[in-house]
Amino acid sequence: MKQLRLEPVVQVRGEINIPGSKSISNRALLLATLAQGKTTLTNLLDSDDIRHMLASLKQLGVNYRLSQDNTVCELDGLGGVISSESAQELFLGNAGTAMRPLCAALTLGQGEFTLTGEPRMEERPIGDLVDALRQLGANVVYLKNDGFPPLTINATGLNGGDVEIAGDLSSQFLTALLMVAPLAKGSVNIHVKGELVSKPYIDITLALMAQFGVTVINHDYARFEIVAGQRYVSPGKVLVEGDASSASYFLAAGAIKGGEVKVTGVGRLSIQGDVKFADVLEKMGADIEWGDDYIIARGSQLTAVDLDMNHIPDAAMTIATAALFAKGTTVIRNIYNWRIKETDRLAAMATELRKVGAEVEEGNDYIKITPPAVINTAEIDTYNDHRMAMCFSMLAFADCGITINDPDCTSKTFPDYFKQFASLQG
């Protein structure tokens, strides 16, 4: 197993241009596919999850051209649904942002489509989405365990009508349903059951759908109305914002050991909810400065917070490791959906924080972290989860440094993360 030793860092300073957002990249690729016309996507994220989406689209007959560095994609839209005369089997790795939307999109056309992935993908639920698609006439068959991939779609199109979908586990199910609703055979009324988690990710979806010419009537996130007869039309060019979750590590670095760290590609005009991570750092005592497309973090003594972070679940992980440098006990609440991500992030985070000496209480949907008087060095297991590796890079700011096991798992969203992280030191 590969290991990366991060020696103690005294101070950080510098500027980082954040790579494209995973959430926006895969949504935009699918909408561009369904749209009429040619779309040029710039600042596309070059990572495993996006490669799985691109490979699947190519297999389904979508034509696109990538720049040499894979960050510009010119894609020829199908001007409608995806169909295939021959049976197709698509491997989607552990990419939830490809599995869920493609599962929904492939019900719209004609053909037989089987979706598979890595072993962890077979533990990541998709039942709430499939239940909703079945209400609209979709034929979806589970191949192993009910409610989980792999699965086969026997597509004949999607009917309109009223549909209920659970909102309390993952916003990706609602996102997938919203994106395909305009291409159903009639108007679609989506009723959300339970409290909707990660609302800002739904805002990303609605903003991108609007960019491609589709109107959704949002009734306070409890009901969504999509009138029949709409179609996606390419806006020509789509700029993919920097990934706000990825920005969180560099902003936390500035808050803990600044110096001054500036991240570009996200700012006050961002459509991503995870930029609100900077507000949490500010509550902890960091000095934060906002621009339209940048955020600056400067360091100071941090103090603990007790907050509901359901709206920023990915970025909230960074608060868990930043808490080791804060005075007092930090509590991160309403984060049950950490448990169904790339790994069970609540259990993994608690285990690894204890390794470095923290006192941790792991609840069903919360975590309490009290930092130790002295942080211990340790070998951090990353569970093939990119965010675990990046979060625990913050331990380089302890006097003892840290060792990260399997650091290359960051390739899921940020292949050169540790190179960028090293550029801030000094």
Swiss-Prot record:
List of catalytic residues: D314
GO biological process terms held by the UniProt record: amino acid biosynthetic process; aromatic amino acid family biosynthetic process; chorismate biosynthetic process
Classification via NCBIfam families: aroA (TIGR01356)
Record-given protein name: 3-phosphoshikimate 1-carboxyvinyltransferase
Role, per record: Catalyzes the transfer of the enolpyruvyl moiety of phosphoenolpyruvate (PEP) to the 5-hydroxyl of shikimate-3-phosphate (S3P) to produce enolpyruvyl shikimate-3-phosphate and inorganic phosphate.
Top EC group: transferase
Keyword Amino-acid biosynthesis applies: yes
Subunit structure: Monomer.
Residues at which 3-phosphoshikimate binds: K22, S23, R27, S170, S171, Q172, S198, D314, N337, K341
HAMAP family the UniProt entry points to: EPSP_synth
Source organism superkingdom: Bacteria
Chief subcellular location: cytoplasm
GO MF terms, alphabetically ordered: 3-phosphoshikimate 1-carboxyvinyltransferase activity
Pfam families: EPSP_synthase (PF00275)
PROSITE patterns hit by this protein: EPSP_SYNTHASE_1, EPSP_SYNTHASE_2
Record PANTHER family: AROM/DEHYDROQUINATE SYNTHASE, PENTAFUNCTIONAL AROM POLYPEPTIDE
Compartment(s) of residence: Cytoplasm
EC number per UniProt: 2.5.1.19
CDD domains: EPSP_synthase
GO CC, alphabetical: cytoplasm
Similarity comment text for this entry: Belongs to the EPSP synthase family.
Pathways per UniProt: Metabolic intermediate biosynthesis; chorismate biosynthesis; chorismate from D-erythrose 4-phosphate and phosphoenolpyruvate: step 6/7
Keywords: Amino-acid biosynthesis, Aromatic amino acid biosynthesis, Cytoplasm, Transferase
Binding residues annotated for phosphoenolpyruvate, in chain numbering: K22, G96, R124, Q172, R345, R387, K412
The reaction(s) this protein catalyses: 3-phosphoshikimate + phosphoenolpyruvate = 5-O-(1-carboxyvinyl)-3-phosphoshikimate + phosphate
